[in-house]
UniProtKB/Swiss-Prot annotation:
Pathway: Protein modification; protein ubiquitination. GO terms for biological process: ATP export; mitochondrion inheritance; positive regulation of ubiquitin-dependent endocytosis; protein monoubiquitination; protein polyubiquitination; response to glucose; ubiquitin-dependent endocytosis; ubiquitin-dependent protein catabolic process via the multivesicular body sorting pathway. It comes from the Eukaryota. The gene is BUL1. This is Ubiquitin ligase-binding protein BUL1. Present with 486 molecules/cell in log phase SD medium.
Amino acid sequence: MAKDLNDSGFPPKRKPLLRPQRSDFTANSSTTMNVNANTRGRGRQKQEGGKGSSRSPSLHSPKSWIRSASATGILGLRRPELAHSHSHAPSTGTPAGGNRSPLRRSTANATPVETGRSLTDGDINNVVDVLPSFEMYNTLHRHIPQGNVDPDRHDFPPSYQEANNSTATGAAGSSADLSHQSLSTDALGATRSSSTSNLENLIPLRTEHHSIAAHQSTAVDEDSLDIPPILDDLNDTDNIFIDKLYTLPKMSTPIEITIKTTKHAPIPHVKPEEESILKEYTSGDLIHGFITIENKSQANLKFEMFYVTLESYISIIDKVKSKRTIKRFLRMVDLSASWSYSKIALGSGVDFIPADVDYDGSVFGLNNSRVLEPGVKYKKFFIFKLPLQLLDVTCKQEHFSHCLLPPSFGIDKYRNNCKYSGIKVNRVLGCGHLGTKGSPILTNDMSDDNLSINYTIDARIVGKDQKASKLYIMKEREYNLRVIPFGFDANVVGERTTMSQLNDITKLVQERLDALRKIFQRLEKKEPITNRDIHGADLSGTIDDSIESDSQEILQRKLDQLHIKNRNNYLVNYNDLKLGHDLDNGRSGNSGHNTDTSRAWGPFVESELKYKLKNKSNSSSFLNFSHFLNSSSSSMSSSSNAGKNNHDLTGNKERTGLILVKAKIPKQGLPYWAPSLLRKTNVFESKSKHDQENWVRLSELIPEDVKKPLEKLDLQLTCIESDNSLPHDPPEIQSITTELICITAKSDNSIPIKLNSELLMNKEKLTSIKALYDDFHSKICEYETKFNKNFLELNELYNMNRGDRRPKELKFTDFITSQLFNDIESICNLKVSVHNLSNIFKKQVSTLKQHSKHALSEDSISHTGNGSSSSPSSASLTPVTSSSKSSLFLPSGSSSTSLKFTDQIVHKWVRIAPLQYKRDINVNLEFNKDIKETLIPSFESCLCCRFYCVRVMIKFENHLGVAKIDIPISVRQVTK
């Protein structure tokens, strides 16, 4: 039986890691994590005597806070109104005047406590969202405490202080010999770095490169040397960072772990209602559940640590390079669910008694001895709260869109020895899974087998081989979640354009290559190498050769300056915002023929179509509008007839001109679309009370005009006739069709710039950019080889004029850092896939609204103006009409449909100037009912992105051609 934490104690010769404030402290006391942290500090002062106390820099440095570490709350800090309501709740078996919480179960019996109200969907949802202290996280969960093997080893609380540069340098290496660092990628494609940072640059999540070759199992962390581990007085040889938990070997042990999610917070001695396998979580939702651990053997099994985490990662497979890249962008540790010496209050507020027996025979908690007894099933409750956004340090380049939660995308078919590789999409249901809870859900979201974004709840038991003194994973289990984040807009005010970011990186790379060429010229001439040669022209005159300067640090500051410019508050012209100027030329075009109109339209895209028609007959009208009207009327303006006589004298028998198509980039977005089975399971009514309140609260943050789903696109056609062309009516539209374009991009290194659909759809431009960076990559590799070959000679020239000063090493990373090299590789390895979906939207005729004839007539009159007016001022609003009996687009005899189509969608040409006409088009966007694809929300992360465009194709009569325009739109989940 598990050891009750209320008993006298802890194992012999072992002291509790969380020291009590009072001598009568018991495990059932409800204390805050910050109190525990302060207590540890006092305990450490006692041990060290007169050394004095050192305050942790993390308490004063917001950058060091682990904001997403856990959703674990503190019962003592619960809302006052909740505590007040609980204080009046009846409790059986509690003495009068007792101070027992109504949420605690009495030890006298095993029946649930009566609180006077439902705990499943009421007060339990008032979760206290208080984060644990940094010291507690670092002590308990960043390091795995040792001592189970050696009973004489004590895990004393550490003291925290900033690491000195000398300490970090000494730890890296003590050799005084000059050594250079190579940037060449090894067999796994990972780069090495020697850059350092201080304690404030806490980046707990990293990108890993794994080999998928059969003969290799190496895992390389591309950031492992960029960000040194957090230093404290713990012996690193006796502890392991949680960041390296994924590299531990796995052993087969007779331990069974089960993970189950529940609709509400589990209550002791009450059977919970399990959550559906098709549940979709969104930003701010609570994830409740419990974990059971059972030793199936006949002997005791010792373990070192037990972790319960909510993790998210991106997996990219490169079969050509036999490489698997993993980017972990979220890891939340539930301190109350993981093992610790003391009981930590649950974030849900539900209390339990350690070592008590639940309704299913399981024992609450894990004992302090860290021993799994045979035949005993242990249970731990967990609760996680999905964040609204990620930590700022998630993206090195500081892109806001990279710090938003991406949606679940594809499935990781290479995890756990390809455990999920057999999952296929059911054509009828539109999704597929293994049929067991915890299985990932595969939908037709246009992802390939080599790219996935995954959310999992992971439980891991870490053990230690007593003979080899090596840590290993005794057992691990994952529970896959489907997460569709709330539709926050990733386009922020003041964000720089894609091309401006790319140009800055290009200039920096060219400057670094110029510096390398300069030192090689110095090498040929045997001339001394100065700091000016290394730092480039922009720092000439500011860096003196006598000054001790760190070249790598200077280059890193240049990169940091580029990243600072990526922030959304960089040089915002608020006057332009008021005028409606376009802030992102990378996403939209600027019309040169009408600046005022461009300001009124705001962000827009445009395309053009040149047309050329031969003269077929002497008819006064070659093109007509009866295609939609099915009527036989004929009229032309007197100005057109007069112009015809003048143009006939030139002898030109052709009609030529230019059609410009311009479209607004809408603020609204298309709604997230999932298979019907998922939609029915995740309706608003099926959510818990907390999740419903969370959804309403998030919806209030979105403006009403943005919250409304995108239902139509506004286009404007401008027809400009050539000066030497025969007079003619502007071309008539034969048909309008729409299709949805899905653009997916990925790279196995962090993408340094913010991408957009226009760049990814422009194959010619993207190819030229990749060719340029391929050239950069080859030159860097060439220069690195030459640098390594002449390493000693270059350092002699660099230290030639240093005199009596200590020699200083010149490294290749002084010119090209690993981060800059990764940026170049990322652009070189950028891959784009495009899917054209033609069956997403209904045909335009099927979207027509039913209006009365009176309303229809008024709409037509108000749009075209009074055509009978002959004054010059009204001539600019004169609609152009002509005659024909063509009906290629609409069924014959549907004159009412033709009128509605003209009035609601295509409207009529309006003459606005000599030889210039304008026409407004409203393209309706309505989903078909039988969509088989899943439209996940638009997103952009460090390794991959998904964008959408609506392609509108306007086909003109008489084989004139088709005008195409791709309008960037977003897909969001903002409505239920």
